[in-house]
């Protein structure tokens, strides 16, 4: 009987981004409607769709061997799991999200202490209660099923603790952020007993390596160019390569072929500079995976 890894894939806002990341990493996950057990092109993995809020619970109790969920929900559930690696991606960006404390724009509240005796709405009830209790501030924390920002506007709460990536929804409701309570990102986690199993640990490490390499590749591009030999030093001097560039002679020519990997953010400024220094035939190409 073939060993298999029981892997949890987050349902909801992270689902599409996670499936796309797996695709770029070499695994194709096919989700069927009204079916929580998608197919995957790997006989050694069995997938299950699970809410990110509950993922760490199922990983901790062994229902799943491993899964992807937010650092925030691991903290909320106080789950005792092995964190394999951080994977910084989300539904809209490649930056960590933030859980923030916010109040109405015209609220007199300026500090945490000003919320003594206040009512706070949030989906992260356990974390929020512990956060204020640790600071000796007595507050009433209520669970919010959604549209949390509207609770302050409608007077149902004095403040909210809500996750944000861009702050656009918070600003749209006229709210003001008092304090950032935590940063969060996706993490690959494993059941501690499963992590001790050689097959499962090897498979989980394979997942971690390939998923991280695909995320790294998102931020980088490759550049290839031809450079006259006499101008090579000038061109190479301005290259912000991860490592030394690859340089080779063109066949029966005094020209060189130069190839580098650079951060995508520098390309728009770098290419004009390369042309000025004498490079020609510059080609930019995307990368699927980058491993260090």
From Swiss-Prot:
Cofactor(s) for this UniProt protein: Mg(2+)
**Associated pathway:** Amino-acid biosynthesis; L-histidine biosynthesis; L-histidine from 5-phospho-alpha-D-ribose 1-diphosphate: step 1/9
Q: What reaction(s) does this enzyme catalyze?
A: 1-(5-phospho-beta-D-ribosyl)-ATP + diphosphate = 5-phospho-alpha-D-ribose 1-diphosphate + ATP
Question: What regulates the activity here?
Answer: Feedback inhibited by histidine.
GO BP? L-histidine biosynthetic process
**SUPFAM superfamilies registered for this protein in UniProt:** GlnB-like (SSF54913), Periplasmic binding protein-like II (SSF53850)
Q: Which Gene3D superfamilies match?
A: 3.30.70.120, Periplasmic binding protein-like II
Origin: domain of life: Bacteria
The cross-references to CDD domains, in alphabetical order and at most eight, read:
PBP2_HisGL3 (cd13593)
What's a Pfam family this protein contains? Answer: HisG_C
Function (record text): Catalyzes the condensation of ATP and 5-phosphoribose 1-diphosphate to form N'-(5'-phosphoribosyl)-ATP (PR-ATP). Has a crucial role in the pathway because the rate of histidine biosynthesis seems to be controlled primarily by regulation of HisG enzymatic activity.
Q: Which family does it belong to?
A: Belongs to the ATP phosphoribosyltransferase family. Long subfamily.
Recorded protein name is ATP phosphoribosyltransferase
Q: Which organism is it from?
A: Desulfatibacillum aliphaticivorans
């Amino acid at each position: 009987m073939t060993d298999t890894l029981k892997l949890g894939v987050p349902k909801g806002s992270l689902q599409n981004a996670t499936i796309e990341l797996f695709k770029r990493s070499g695994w194709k996950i096919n989700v069927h409607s009204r079916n929580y057990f998608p197919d995957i092109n790997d006989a050694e993995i069995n997938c299950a769709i699970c809410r990110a809020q509950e993922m760490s619970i199922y990983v901790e109790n062994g229902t799943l061997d491993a899964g992807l969920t937010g650092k925030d929900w691991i903290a909320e559930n106080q789950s005792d799991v092995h964190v394999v690696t951080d994977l910084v991606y989300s539904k809209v960006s490649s930056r960590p999200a933030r859980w923030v404390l916010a109040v109405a724009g015209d609220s007199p509240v300026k500090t945490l202490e000003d919320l003594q005796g206040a009512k706070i709405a949030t989906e992260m009830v356990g974390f929020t209660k512990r956060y204020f209790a640790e600071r000796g501030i007595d507050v009433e924390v209520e669970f919010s099923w959604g549209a949390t920002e509207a609770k302050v506007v409608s007077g149902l709460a004095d403040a909210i603790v809500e996750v944000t990536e861009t702050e656009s929804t918070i600003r749209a409701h006229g709210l003001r952020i008092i304090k950032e309570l935590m940063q969060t990102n996706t993490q690959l986690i494993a059941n501690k007993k499963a992590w001790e199993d050689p097959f499962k640990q090897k498979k989980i490490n394979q997942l971690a390596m390939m998923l991280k390499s695909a995320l790294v590749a998102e931020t980088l591009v490759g550049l290839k160019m031809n450079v006259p030999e006499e101008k090579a030093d000038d061109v190479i001097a301005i290259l912000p390569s991860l490592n030394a560039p690859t340089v080779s002679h063109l066949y029966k020519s005094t020209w060189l072929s130069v190839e580098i990997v650079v951060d995508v953010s520098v390309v728009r400024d770098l290419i004009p500079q390369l042309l000025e220094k004498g490079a020609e035939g510059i080609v930019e190409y995307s990368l699927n995976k980058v491993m260090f």
